[in-house]
């Protein structure tokens, strides 16, 4: 693979803390799930936890670690069902940044985010401290000036959490950073995309795929020689340098006869079990590729709801893709000709589904109206609020859909806000991104105002 190197006058970013216990490239779908997951209000001292494990093992007649693992699995399932109603919000101050589009947990304290104003930063959810990460620049740096206003739409960590993929200063280019230091490793700016990158998915620790507004998906392979430090730093002046790489494969999605100009790739999701890559395009189609050393398209399916299909996630346990649209979440099993799970309606005033994530049988839905909803795939219904009739009774369903309403965030009250929106005092934020840290039982949620002309942000830690 031909490589070129570029220097960047970047101060070295502080190393992020090791030991991340968070959701990965598919949000909830790949959360680590280490240890028993107890709601915070029900945590017990370690000695009491061990006693509970022992007694539970005796109760079911189990012996050894297998019994404990089974009980921990039960606890994890219980936590998945009960956690949403136990969460409370603490808003984070992001200053004047504009609309957070993407986020991922790096460890128990730090979340990396990308914004519409093309800012890549790490926020410490405990202290609120923000560290900006310099963006990588194309070999032809002037090209980035023509793409103001796009921003960073995707951030994904590889399975081992040693590499981070996102956009460069030019949103057409794929940037790869090393973790935990966030040193620049390489930039995919050669013979790649001709328009903005909207989505990224990792196929393995060294292979990533990007989806673009130009209607293509590109497969990138990171050379192992990049990791040995031989090209990581300029030996004389100490400037970080990075390789410039080209994709191993580029595939165009088929043109739909109904709207051939709107075949923009909006979201990607990878099935590790089947080694298949799913993609959603804005012309209302779902596409599936076999992902090996190259991409081989298997099928394209017309989606039942075709407007604003902007998010996609996959659940390995259920072998299901979930697609978020303007008013619905559709479920797809590419191996079934007849889909058995009916679409769910978000019923949020037509503001759309803006973010999705799976964990076990629960799907979390971030809406364009500033709320989080939780849907149980097995029961095929939304989680409901719980109400207790007395102190001695177990809480039961109250019959109302469980909805977490996010705070106001920050809104720039500029001329656009005054002239076009009448100076509305309350303006809900679209929840463009959310990610779970299951071992810490935390949920990071972020976004900003839905209208493109408004400038603002929201970020909150739910725990």
Curated annotation (Swiss-Prot):
This is DDB1- and CUL4-associated factor 12-like protein 2. SUPFAM superfamilies: WD40 repeat-like. InterPro entries: Beta-prop_DCAF12, DCAF12, WD40/YVTN_repeat-like_dom_sf, WD40_repeat_dom_sf, WD40_rpt. SMART domains: WD40. It comes from the Eukaryota. Transmembrane segments: none annotated. Belongs to the WD repeat DCAF12 family. WD repeats lie at residues 89-137, 138-184, 185-252, 253-297, 298-341, 342-401, 402-445. Residues 15-33 have a biased composition (Low complexity). Residues 1-48 are annotated as: Disordered. Keywords: Repeat, WD repeat. GO terms for cellular component: Cul4-RING E3 ubiquitin ligase complex. It comes from Homo sapiens (Human). Pfam families: Beta-prop_DCAF12 (PF23760).
């Amino acid at each position: 693979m031909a490589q070129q190197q570029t220097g960047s006058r970047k101060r070295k970013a502080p190393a992020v803390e090791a030991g991340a216990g968070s959701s990965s490239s598919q949000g909830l779908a790949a959360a680590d799930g280490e240890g028993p997951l107890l709601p915070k209000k029900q945590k017990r001292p370690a000695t009491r936890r061990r006693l509970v494990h022992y007694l539970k093992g005796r109760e079911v007649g189990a012996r050894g670690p297998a019994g404990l693992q089974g009980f921990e699995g039960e606890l994890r399932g219980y936590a998945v069902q009960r956690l949403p109603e136990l969460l409370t919000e603490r808003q984070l101050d992001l200053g004047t940044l504009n609309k957070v589009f993407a986020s991922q947990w790096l460890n128990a304290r730090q979340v990396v985010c990308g914004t519409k104003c093309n800012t890549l930063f790490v926020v410490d959810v405990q202290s609120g401290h923000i560290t900006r990460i310099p963006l990588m620049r194309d070999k032809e740096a002037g090209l980035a000036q023509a793409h103001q206003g796009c921003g960073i739409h995707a951030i994904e960590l590889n399975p081992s959490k040693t590499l981070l993929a996102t956009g460069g200063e030019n949103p057409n280019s794929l940037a790869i950073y090393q973790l935990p230091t966030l040193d620049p490793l390489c930039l995919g700016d050669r013979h790649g995309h001709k328009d903005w990158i909207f989505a990224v998915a990792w196929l393995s620790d060294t292979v990533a795929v990007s989806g673009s507004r130009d209607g293509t998906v590109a497969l990138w392979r990171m050379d192992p020689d990049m990791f040995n430090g031989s090209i990581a730093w300029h030996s004389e002046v100490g400037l970080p340098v990075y390789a410039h790489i080209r994709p191993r494969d580029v595939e165009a999605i088929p043109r739909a006869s109904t709207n051939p100009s709107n075949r923009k790739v909006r979201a990607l999701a990878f099935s590790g079990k089947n080694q298949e890559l799913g993609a959603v395009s804005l012309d209302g189609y779902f596409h599936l590729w076999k992902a090996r050393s190259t991409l081989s398209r298997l099928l394209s399916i017309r989606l039942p709801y075709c407007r604003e299909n902007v998010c996609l996630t996959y659940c390995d346990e259920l072998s299901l893709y979930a697609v978020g649209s303007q008013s619905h979440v559709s479920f797809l099993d590419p191996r079934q000709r007849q889909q058995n799970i009916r679409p769910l309606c978000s019923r949020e005033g037509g503001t759309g589904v803006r973010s999705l994530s799976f964990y076990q049988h629960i799907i979390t839905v971030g809406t364009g109206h500033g709320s989080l909803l939780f849907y149980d795939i097995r029961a095929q219904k939304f989680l409901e609020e719980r109400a207790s009739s007395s102190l001695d009774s177990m809480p039961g369903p109250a019959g109302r859909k469980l909805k977490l309403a996010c705070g106001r965030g920050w809104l720039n009250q500029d001329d656009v806000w005054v002239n076009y929106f009448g100076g509305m005092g309350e303006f809900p934020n679209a929840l463009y991104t959310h990610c779970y840290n299951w071992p810490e039982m935390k949920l990071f949620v972020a976004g900003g105002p839905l209208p493109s002309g408004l400038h603002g942000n929201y970020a909150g830690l739910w725990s």
